[in-house]
Amino acid sequence: MVNEDAKKVWAYIDEHEQEYIDLLKKYCAQPSVSAQNWGMREMAEMIRQTITELGGNGTLIETGGNPFVYGMIDNGAERTLTLYNHYDVVPPEPYEQWNTPPFEPTIIDGRLYARGSSDNKGSLLSRYIAVDAYQKVLGKLPINIKFVAEGEEEIGSPHLM
């Protein structure tokens, strides 16, 4: 059984579905191909901005490779949840195997097609959307949230350590 607060959050997400889809399209339209160093800093900056809009202190951390994005919503809670994601994608080649251009998000039969839509920009945004919806509906989270997003997972995370 779903509690009433959860129903309110889900209703908010449903009401703002197009806004969230548009944000996912924006993320997927931004290339972030780590193997080709294509669009990495721009994507990191987009994520930093989203964290800031959620009320966190988003910042880029230089690594010698692609930047890490770090942020925190500090609610003074005893517990902290860390959300790890990566923002890089694999190269889109070969292009001829795509039915639509990989960095032009397209909805077909209710599904969004674009490079990174499921690995990993959709996953990253689903967590951020949950934080956004909770805060808009219920106010302050009962926990602190740390956001960590790296830009080299698809090439073995050489600067993670």
Which sequence ranges carry the predicted segments?
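Acidic/His- and Gly-rich active-site-bordering loop/insert found
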Residues: 2-115, 136-143
